[in-house]
Design a protein with these regions (language model features):
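An acidic, glycine-rich, mixed-charge low-complexity segment common to nucleic-acid enzymes
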Residues: 1-148, 212
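Conserved binding-pocket/active-site segment within a compact domain
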Residues: 105-206
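Non-transmembrane domains of secretory- and envelope-associated proteins
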Residues: 206-212
């Protein structure tokens, strides 16, 4: 199966996680989803314009490849993880080095393949927990500083990407987490979010100089 732009646009979530080629997953995500800023208009006066900034370095966290979720990686540096996934860290390696990781995070592999649709608000609902008052659900979102949630229902599952504000930016948000069948979202309020455009994040040559 070839993972390309048409695949991302039309993917319905119907795939066995064990059959996903993780190198191809990372490559197609880098090419068509990450390293972009996504621009939206909303019906909320507090946030008339919303920007989501999604970088390559967010990918490992969304896959559950962190110290908290996978116990036996040789590195937890996001850039190194991405490079290893494109080379020799195939799915069998990740499973054999921590069997519990796959059991707990396999649906996130599917969720990452749905990120194109989530970020383009394609057949999605957009929610906010900002108006939840005095509830356990509200406290969880407040703790994680989640402002917005984009939800895609498909193949009898709900995939949600949670968005938190970028430091020192009022209307720019970054992916906080990717969740599946999170019941907390049903306490959230639905809002209208319209995708306007996306722009490739240009590589900063000055900051990147000297990096290997």
């Amino acid at each position: 199966m070839e993972y390309d732009l048409e695949f991302l646009k039309n993917f319905d979530g119907n795939i066995l996680p064990s059959l996903i080629n993780i190198s191809d997953l990372v490559n197609v995500t880098e090419k068509h989803v990450s390293q972009f800023r996504y621009f939206y208009s909303s019906d909320k006066s507090e946030f008339p314009e919303i920007i989501i900034e999604f970088k390559n370095l967010h990918i490992p966290h969304l896959l559950g490849l962190s110290k908290d979720h996978h116990l036996n990686l040789s590195t937890y540096q996001a850039r190194e993880i991405i490079n290893n996934l494109k080379r020799d860290w195939n799915l069998e390696y990740l499973k054999s080095s921590d069997e519990q990781w796959f059991a707990e995070n396999k649906d996130k592999l599917v969720g990452v393949l749905l990120l194109y649709q989530l970020l383009h608000v394609q057949n999605c609902r957009v929610l906010t927990p900002l108006y939840i008052i005095n509830s356990n659900f509200g406290r969880r979102f407040k703790r994680d500083n989640v402002y917005f949630i984009i939800l895609r229902s498909t193949n009898n599952k709900e995939y949600t990407i949670e968005l938190a504000p970028m430091k020192n930016h009022d209307n720019v948000f970054i992916p906080k987490s990717l969740k599946i069948n999170d019941t907390h979202v049903h306490k959230c309020s639905e809002i209208s979010l319209t995708f306007l455009r996306s722009e490739r994040i240009k590589y900063d040559k000055k900051r990147g100089k000297g990096r290997k």
